[in-house]
């Protein structure tokens, strides 16, 4: 029933968008109004949603209300995979989502699964914004049928656990829930942990019943799902950035007048910076919530991070073998 309902909603949204696209006086182009759907699979109180809403707001502002975007959150129009497919088909022009589910559609995006590349979020953002690298990644999206408008983030993914991690050896044997991603599994195995893929809906109970010791996610997810209530420690492994892409169907974008393309590009730029600022503020707030609960936050020293990188060499080699070497080298350029 859920899938049938979503298909009905999608059909209604597409029909509405088509009807609104023609609204306005035929003799007055400035009064023409558009209403295009933008979909996410994320809850409303997330950076993903903030990113989407800010983009829609700026589109309206920069076009003097002529261009309109309606945001649909909470998987209203489908889950991550559904949204990618319907965006590629052109039924939903815009999608905002994490890059992780996109790897199965665009293999070169596995570059973002390279572990422990960056020492800080600023370094990561500088890399994403590097014109040469951004163009390479944009081309990956174009080949997939999308146009990349912007890439924000939700900070780094960190580890929460009931077993403290003070040194590299403390990862050994920890039963940690991971996403169903071969590179993620390989990383945790490489550093001595015992990774266990599990549906996210089962994680809280798994921690509560001690079928797993640990899990990994951005701070926002750890707090919004109350996972910290079942954990004694949060370890700032910062092993992967949690990147959020804003994409549009490529044919749809190319068919727009040049001035509207420019409005979208500028709106996305503003929304990306805003989402990053909001993410930073929200992470600080989430950390305070965790600390107030009595859960301790642990940071890793340089030696431990160096040992993690050394142990992860096999993961680097595997990803390097499976993606465009130009993209791999551009991502790793300047990384010691």
Language-model region placement:
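Short, small-residue-biased leader/transition segments that mark boundaries at the very start
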Residues: 1-5
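N-terminal secretory/targeting leader peptides
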Residues: 24-123, 141-143, 147-336
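A gly/proline- and charged-residue-enriched helix-loop-helix capping module
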Residues: 122-138
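C-terminal motif of bacterial Sec signal peptides marking the signal peptidase cleavage site
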Residues: 19-22
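Sec-dependent N-terminal signal peptides
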Residues: 9-15
